[in-house]
Amino acid sequence: MKLATYNLNGIRARLPRLLEWLAREQPDVVCLQELKCADESLPIADIESAGYGAVWHGQKGFNGVAVLAKGDTPELRRVGLPGDPDDTHSRYIEAQVQGVVVGSLYLPNGNPVGTEKFDYKLRWMERLCAHAAELLKEERPAVLCGDWNVVPEDRDVFSVRATQHDAVMQPEARQAWRRIVHQGWTDALRAFHPSDEKLYTFWDYTAGCWQRDLGFRLDHLLCSPEAADRLQGAGVDKWARGEEKASDHAPTWVALG
């Protein structure tokens, strides 16, 4: 099973790129983020024509997440992250595909630091930490994947000095990330590329970041022990970022046996 995560930065604007990537890479399961699209406006017919069933949690103009499965419709388990019934942001959806629990998440960016946006990010991460612990109790293959908006280590960004004030770099966010990982989750991409220094998944549109490879590793796939036992590979489809009118993120994937 090839399971991928892809922040589209607008599904309607990037639909040609999504369909091109699906046809070329043929992933079995896809977690999408930043649909920026209401439920009724999702181009589901195009997705189905590409051979994928889908469940989704949309929001007009912002956020939005989905899970796609090739030749099947994912079994929906949860819409929204537990812990705050007043949170209306469409940032989490969970489904089951071929016995694997898949969570597609779009973690809050948190900028600017020192505002309610950053506080919300940390609260959201605490809720995710609690939910991740509950998932592990099920003792089944599970993968939490998406745009985490966290740079885990200094080597996961092109320049610490240039980005030190960004919310994705803050110690509180990194500590929250580690609390989740230390529950027993495996950072699959780093596990297969332990020494890579430019293991990026995101390149900003501004200042020629893509052309100069000034990137961040923001998109992660965390595997439960039962999923980690089946890991066969992981990578980044970097070519997709270089296409015309591409998302600022590249698809990132794991292979499970």
Where are these regions (language model features)?
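Active-site-proximal beta-strand elements of phosphoester/diester hydrolases
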Residues: 1-10, 99-114, 145, 249
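N-terminal, active-site-proximal structural segment of metallo-dependent hydrolase catalytic domains
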Residues: 1-49, 56, 63-65
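Active-site beta-strand/loop signature of hydrolases that rely on acidic residues for catalysis
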Residues: 6-7, 22-40, 102, 131-154, ...
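Structured beta-strand-rich core segments of catalytic domains in phosphoester-bond hydrolases
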Residues: 35-36, 44-112
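Metal-dependent phosphoesterases centered on the DNase I-like endonuclease/exonuclease/phosphatase
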Residues: 50, 124-218
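Conserved beta strand-loop-helix elements of the APE1-like EEP
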Residues: 61-76, 196, 209-230, 256
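Surface-exposed cleft-lining segments at the edges of enzyme active sites
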Residues: 82-83, 108-125, 161-166
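Surface polyanion/phosphate-binding segment centered on an Asp-His-Pro turn
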Residues: 235-257
